[in-house]
A protein has these predicted regions:
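A short local loop/turn or secondary-structure capping micro-motif enriched for an aromatic residue
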Residues: 26-30, 58, 81-82, 140, ...
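Ligand-binding loop in jelly-roll beta-barrel domains
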Residues: 69, 77-81, 136-138, 142-145, ...
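Short, well-structured hydrophobic secondary-structure segments
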Residues: 28-78
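Double-stranded beta-helix
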Residues: 7, 11-12, 16-21, 27-28, ...
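Short, small/polar residue-rich loop motifs at catalytic or cofactor-binding pockets
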Residues: 3-5, 116-117
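Conserved short histidine dyad/triad with adjacent acidic residue
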Residues: 24, 72-116, 150-153
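A short beta-strand-loop-beta hairpin characteristic of the jelly-roll/cupin
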Residues: 108-116, 121-142
Length: 179
C-alpha cells in the first residue's frame, strides 16, 4: 500500500507561519478490486479561508462540490479485475462507506466508466495507463503526462506489467447535460 508524507502549514495565534502537521497518509485498496488503491490526501468542500491553524478541513464525498477541491493519489495495477472471491454487495457497502459519492458516478453498464461534475487535473507519476472516453477513443499516457479531465465520461485501463500511479487535483464544477 502506498503512503505519502503530508506536511501542512498553518498559523499560530500570533499569525506566524508554523508546521501544523507532518504525517504519513496511506491509501485504501478498493473493495473487490485489489489492484486499485485510492488515497485522499487533502480537500475541502468550501473555499479555504486564511489565516488558519492548518487543521484538516472537514469533507465527506470523494468528489468536490462547486467551490471545493480534492487532492488524491490513484494507483491502478495491471489487469484491473475483480478479486475472484469478492462479494458485490459487501464491496458496494464498503465503497459507499469509504468513498462516498464514488458509486453514484459509475456507469452500471460499462465497468470502470464514470463521469463526475468536476474538472480533474491528473498527473501521471509513474507507469503507463490508457484513458478511454465514451466515444470509444483511447489515449495511452505515461509518466510526466497531464490530463485535464473536463467532466467527461471516462475509464482508466492498465494493460502493462507495472502499476500506474497518478496524482489528481479535483475541483468542483458546473455541469449541464446536453439537450
Amino acid at each position: 500500500m502506498s503512503a505519502f508524507r503530508r506536511v501542512v502549514t498553518g498559523h499560530n495565534a500570533a499569525g506566524v507561519s508554523v508546521i501544523a502537521s507532518d504525517e504519513w497518509v496511506s491509501g485504501v485498496v478498493l473493495p473487490g478490486m485489489p489492484s486499485i488503491e485510492l488515497n485522499r490526501l487533502w480537500g475541502s468542500d468550501t473555499v479555504m479561508r486564511y489565516p488558519d491553524t492548518g487543521a484538516p478541513p472537514v469533507y465527506k464525498d470523494w468528489f468536490a462540490p462547486i467551490g471545493g477541491f480534492r487532492i488524491a493519489e490513484f494507483t491502478i495495477g495491471p489487469a484491473c479485475a475483480a478479486a475472484p472471491d469478492h462479494d458485490d454487495a459487501d464491496a458496494s457497502q464498503q465503497l459507499a462507506r469509504d468513498f462516498p459519492g464514488l458509486l453514484e458516478v459509475m456507469d452500471p453498464e460499462v465497468p470502470g466508466m464514470h463521469r463526475s461534475t468536476t474538472i480533474d487535473f491528473i498527473y501521471i507519476l509513474f507507469g503507463r495507463i490508457e484513458l478511454e472516453l465514451d466515444d470509444g477513443s483511447k489515449t495511452q499516457l505515461k509518466a510526466g503526462d497531464l490530463v485535464v479531465q473536463s467532466a467527461t465520461k471516462h475509464a482508466w485501463h492498465n494493460h502493462w506489467q507495472e502499476p500506474c500511479r497518478m496524482l489528481g487535483v479535483i475541483l468542483g464544477a458546473h455541469y449541464e447535460s446536453p439537450a
